[in-house]
Amino acid sequence: MNRFSTRLMGATATPPPAPPKARSNENLDKIDMSLDDIIKLNRKEGKKQNFPRLNRRLQQSSARQFRMRVRWGIQQNSGFGKNSLSRRGRVMPGKRRPYGVITGLAARKATGIRKGISPMNRPPLSDKNIERYFPALKRKANLLRQNEVQRKPVAALKRPNQLNRKNNIPNNFTRSGNKLSHQKDTRQATFLFRRGLKVQAQLNSEQLLDDVVAKRTRQWRTSTTNGGILTVSIDNPGAVQCPVTQKPRLTRTAVPSFLTKRDQSDIKKVPKGVPLQFDINSVGKQTGMTLNERFGILKEQRATLTFNKGGSRFVTVG
């Protein structure tokens, strides 16, 4: 009895923990639900329990990916669907990157430009705007300038002022038009000589040297003197050059003066020309009429013919 009483006392002293109402309600709901709905609910509960751990992992991996992308210049917008990247930045099998992917420094510039500024309201690229919006570019440009200044050779700075002038006239600038034309002729001569043409250039070298200082005219304004004449002789290999043999001449005996005919000078030679079918002068000789008389007769004949026919629209004036 004592043992039994002690057990009862212990049971009354420590009441059993009551189950939570929420679980009991859920269990009651699950009884009424179908099997598929119960499986879905269990999955959701499992996801909720594991969510904080997964969320922490995702945050760490996203931060690591962002660092790697910034370091290697990978485009941040990996995208979704066909061209999406996996968590490690690799292209998934069967998925390709688009052709217009911007990488490297261009991607950084593009992201910098896009931030907070619409493409319509972008400021023009001046020094002030570069300092304001792209300080990294400004620093890079300054570093490049410093490097260029350091690379300049010291020997160039020690040159005399006369050599450092930009407006120095070259030594060969004193060529005149005649000298240039002489060079042109020689070039033309070599061009023709290579093609089997013999060229004889008649050039007065002394005159050319004298005119170098005196004349400074342009090539197309030079006077046509004996300085630019070219005589070209073309070889004809088909023609056979044989030495001309002197044929024996037949010497005629002189005819005495009394045998020559004197009547040849008296006869008038008719000049050769186009033979006419009739004599023009014969027309006037045969008729003995003037042209006015002839046309007058024709007019009268025409008038009589028209009068005999009757009225006509034409009036002949005699």
Swiss-Prot record:
Positions bearing Phosphoserine: S24, S61, S118
Motif UAP56-binding motif: chain residues: 27-45
Single GO BP term: mRNA export from nucleus
UniProt entry keywords in alphabetical sequence: Acetylation, Isopeptide bond, mRNA transport, Nucleus, Phosphoprotein, RNA-binding, Transport, Ubl conjugation
Subunit structure: Interacts with DDX39B/UAP56 and NXF1; interaction with DDX39B/UAP56 and NXF1 are mutually exclusive. Interacts with SSRP1; required for its recruitment to mRNAs. Interacts with CHTOP.
Protein name (record): UAP56-interacting factor
Lineage of producing organism: Eukaryota, Metazoa, Chordata, Craniata, Vertebrata
Modified residues (N-acetylmethionine): M1
Cross-link for Glycyl lysine isopeptide (Lys-Gly) (interchain with G-Cter in SUMO2), residue positions: K261
GO molecular function: mRNA binding
Ubl conjugation is among the record's keywords: yes
Localization annotation: Nucleus, Nucleoplasm; Nucleus speckle
Crosslink (Glycyl lysine isopeptide (Lys-Gly) (interchain with G-Cter in SUMO1)) position: K140
Originating species: Bos taurus
Function: Required for mRNA export from the nucleus to the cytoplasm. Acts as an adapter that uses the DDX39B/UAP56-NFX1 pathway to ensure efficient mRNA export and delivering to the nuclear pore. Associates with spliced and unspliced mRNAs simultaneously with ALYREF/THOC4.
Family: Belongs to the UIF family.
UniProt entry tagged with the keyword Acetylation: yes
Primary location: nucleus
Residues bearing the modification Phosphothreonine: T14
Ranges for region Disordered: 1-27, 163-183
